[in-house]
């Protein structure tokens, strides 16, 4: 039977890390950087967004990214291609965008249709324009701590941690999730800050006991309410990357994270879902686009 955390002070309330407010602050800095680039180059940075097919979730994400670009003054160039687009045709478009000097960032919305190799397409993007940070060159730079463009969600996670932790040196950090997009990059970023990092996943044996030792918990397993209250020691900082849509009352759906938010109020701080990591991901995409423009000089 799972232990209870009822021994914790029931009146305790964890600090809610406000991802929306931190994202707004980042957007203000990004907008100022865009104005500086316009003053220098005579034109704002350009972001090309490529969507293949009409997956409803992808269309929503793309719409949010286009609107976010408008807010900070980045020019967005939308390329909507039919679902039957061939891989060669997509690679031809990417080659054209790579060569276009008005484009500083290229984002291909994934997942792509099953007949297209995601890895081959993402590897075709110029690493200097790879604002998602997925190109093998940028992955290598991240793993060796030599700069490059960092994946947006992990970058946002670190900014959320920075809002409540001054120095991560020597802290025990547990990452739950081993994806190339989130889990592994976050582990590398935490190592760069000299945290002691353990990477786990839902098949890890004794997972609750491992998590219970952590000062920092990053939950990115895609498993709703996986992290229970008894997994979390008092004073831990929790970043919940998970987002799952579950049936709610009256036929509506509700969004939940990988953390049982109501059970972890004895933590020092925790991100809500929604309103935590999500806003940071798009804000970091914009910041990466500006960084790509600045790196070009």
UniProtKB/Swiss-Prot annotation:
One of its GO terms (biological process) is purine nucleotide biosynthetic process. Pfam families: THF_DHG_CYH (PF00763), THF_DHG_CYH_C (PF02882). NADP(+) binds at residues 177-179, 202, 243. GO terms for cellular component: cytosol. It catalyses: (6R)-5,10-methylene-5,6,7,8-tetrahydrofolate + NADP(+) = (6R)-5,10-methenyltetrahydrofolate + NADPH; (6R)-5,10-methenyltetrahydrofolate + H2O = (6R)-10-formyltetrahydrofolate + H(+). Its EC number is 1.5.1.5, 3.5.4.9. This is Bifunctional protein FolD 2. It comes from Rhizorhabdus wittichii (strain DSM 6014 / CCUG 31198 / JCM 15750 / NBRC 105917 / EY 4224 / RW1). The lineage of its organism: Bacteria, Pseudomonadati, Pseudomonadota, Alphaproteobacteria, Sphingomonadales.
């Amino acid at each position: 039977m799972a232990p209870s955390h009822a021994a914790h002070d029931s009146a305790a309330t964890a600090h809610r890390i406000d991802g929306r407010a931190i994202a707004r602050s980042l957007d203000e800095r990004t907008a100022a950087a865009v104005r500086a680039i316009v003053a220098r180059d005579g034109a704002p940075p350009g972001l090309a967004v490529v969507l293949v097919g009409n997956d409803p979730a992808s269309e929503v994400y793309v719409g949010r990214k286009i609107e976010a670009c408008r807010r900070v003054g980045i020019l967005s160039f939308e390329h909507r291609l039919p679902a039957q687009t061939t891989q060669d045709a997509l690679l031809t478009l990417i080659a054209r965008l790579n060569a276009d000097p008005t484009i500083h960032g290229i984002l291909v919305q994934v997942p792509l249709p099953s007949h297209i190799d995601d890895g081959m397409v993402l590897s075709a993007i110029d690493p200097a324009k790879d604002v998602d940070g997925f190109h093998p060159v940028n992955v290598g730079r991240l793993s060796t701590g030599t700069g490059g463009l960092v994946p947006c969600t992990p970058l946002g996670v670190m900014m959320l941690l920075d809002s409540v932790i001054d120095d991560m040196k020597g802290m025990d950090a547990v990452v739950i999730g081993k994806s190339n997009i989130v889990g592994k990059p976050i582990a590398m970023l935490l190592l760069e800050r000299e945290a002691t990092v353990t990477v786990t996943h839902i098949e890890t044996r004794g997972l609750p006991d491992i998590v219970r030792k952590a000062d920092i918990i990053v939950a990115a397993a895609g498993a709703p309410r996986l992290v229970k209250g008894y997994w979390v020691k008092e004073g831990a900082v929790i970043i919940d990357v998970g987002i799952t849509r579950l049936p709610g009352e009256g036929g509506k759906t509700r969004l939940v994270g990988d953390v049982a938010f109501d059970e972890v109020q004895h933590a020092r701080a925790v991100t809500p879902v929604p309103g935590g990591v999500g806003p940071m991901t798009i804000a970091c995409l914009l910041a990466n686009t500006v960084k790509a423009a600045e790196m070009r000089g």
